[in-house]
UniProtKB/Swiss-Prot annotation:
Protein's name in the database: Large ribosomal subunit protein uL29
Family: Belongs to the universal ribosomal protein uL29 family.
Alphabetically ordered keywords of this record: Ribonucleoprotein, Ribosomal protein
GO cellular component term of the entry, any: cytosolic large ribosomal subunit
Biological process terms in GO annotation: translation
Gene (UniProt): rpmC
């Protein structure tokens, strides 16, 4: 997911996305531990998506404190 797409979402939607990504990462790690994960690169992409969501949330928080 692109950062521009994330910036168009509301803060509540971003928090929902963050929770979804975290649960997906948990599931992927569990699959990796049990040897069922075929696409290990997916973990990397989910981690990056989590970072993007957190970055957008931090930008909004910073903007609110400055405004």
């Amino acid at each position: 997911m692109k950062a521009k797409e994330l910036r168009d979402l509301t803060s509540e939607e971003l928090m929902n996305k963050l929770n979804d990504f975290k649960s997906e990462l948990f599931s992927l790690r569990f699959q990796l531990a049990t040897g069922q994960l075929e696409n290990t690169a997916r973990i990397k992409f989910v981690k990056k998506d989590i970072a993007k969501v957190k970055t957008v949330l931090a930008e909004r928080k910073l903007y609110e404190t400055r405004a």
